[in-house]
Amino acid sequence: MIIQKNIIDGSKIKILPITLEAAKEVASNLLPDDRREVEEGHGQNPLVELVKAAQEGTCVYFNVPNGKTAGMAGVEKGGVVWMLCTSAIHEYPITFAREAKRYIDSRQEDLLWNIVDERNRVHLKLLKFLGFKFLRKISHGPNQLSFIEF
């Protein structure tokens, strides 16, 4: 039997080491803007990419009090931070944002950065709450969509 421990002990939302099942659940239930960002913005298949991330084992998933998986996140080499979410974040929006901040604040990297599809309003709002600064717009991916570096 595998016992999972919270990486961060939040009051309502559990942040746990990723499992293959959680990665598949997130990929199957992505917010529409997150799916669009992965597919149109990066030219990638969310299921393939999230399963690959789970197999690498360096990311976490967020589990809300009603048992739903709200998303998964990770930090890759060089401080590249990412998060993809399901609609479960809307069931506990304030708590989710606070726990996401605790996750970001717990990281040891000197710098966390990435790019975000400028159409992804939920993530832009969350990134601002998390304390990231928006640096510049760039064209990115196979469709040369407008992304914002943070």
Please give the residue ranges for each predicted region.
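Short amphipathic alpha-helix that is part of the acyltransferase structural core
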Residues: 2-44
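Active-site rim helix/loop that mediates acceptor-substrate recognition in acyltransferases
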Residues: 38-58
